[in-house]
Amino acid sequence: MNPTAMCNPSSSSSSSGSSSSTKAWIVHGVAVAAAVAAAYLYLTRPAKFRSRVVGIIPARFASSRFQGKPLVRILGKPMIQRTWERAKMATTLDQVVVATDDEKIAECCRGFGAAVIMTSESCQNGTERCNEALQKLEKKYDVVVNIQGDEPLIEPEVIDGIVRALQATPDAVFSTAVTSLKPEDAFDPNRVKCVVDTRGYAVYFSRGLIPYNKSGKVNPHFPYLLHLGIQSYDTKFLKIYPELPPTPLQLEEDLEQLKVLENGYKMKVIKVDHEAHGVDTPEDVEKIEQFMRERNFL
């Protein structure tokens, strides 16, 4: 018997095993190196990374759905005041200001003690208004929180949550929050839906129901997400946002978040246990007042 022939299978098997083992170690080494690099970048960030934070409440009088919405009274107080009072309770904000192009809104806000920044009428959305207000502030900030003026019951903890998420995620330039979507809001275009990936980054936002299954019906077992409309930005990104070209999805859905995603930037999303109470139409005022009365939230 040829001893060489007897050894060949064993030798081949050994060689194959060795090759597989080597490949496994290479893959493992690459993964470890990537983890070490990520940890290094995280740990070597400046000690005060994104530490200076300003909250800006953009407010405009003109609205196709609800003219003069910021000044509508909710149980005796202007809605913009209720939003400002809630924002002031957030512990991560160094300052809270209102940005508006309307003198009536500015006068109202100064009356209850809010700092006001006057902006131009040319701002296309709240993000652009926040950017213009940022340029006019005397102090320098690392993070801007865009606080929707039509969320008079916004939880301070939600504001703090998105700020901390942005501070902890160096590769994201934007952060926002979502909560569970109610079945009755599934097909309401005023309730923006969101899908996220397994790492908590935004994949898409839509006024339609997403994901949308073949039956065309709401799946009662699927955890649909509702966007809360509050967002924070790294100020370096915010300054270039107006220069980014409008994108097809942004224009089709009329959602400024899509401009960020379509231009290739990352957006961190946190899930919170918060019931959304946005005011989009005059009918919403009565609903939110009833909610506040029931909970003695005056």
Predicted regions and their residues:
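Conserved core of the sugar-phosphate nucleotidyltransferase
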Residues: 154-247
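Short, high-confidence coil segments that cap the C-terminus of an alpha-helix
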Residues: 93, 139-141, 169-172, 265
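Terminal signal-anchor or tail-anchor transmembrane helices
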Residues: 7-10, 14-46
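N-terminal glycine-rich phosphate-binding loop and ensuing alpha1 helix
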Residues: 48-99
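Terminal low-complexity segments of carbohydrate-biosynthetic enzymes
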Residues: 1-16, 27, 266, 289-298
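Short phosphate-binding loop-to-helix
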Residues: 97, 103-164
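Short aromatic/basic micro-patch
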Residues: 65, 73, 153, 232, ...
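Conserved alpha/beta core of the MobA/IspD/sugar-nucleotide pyrophosphorylase nucleotidyltransferase superfamily
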Residues: 139, 219-298
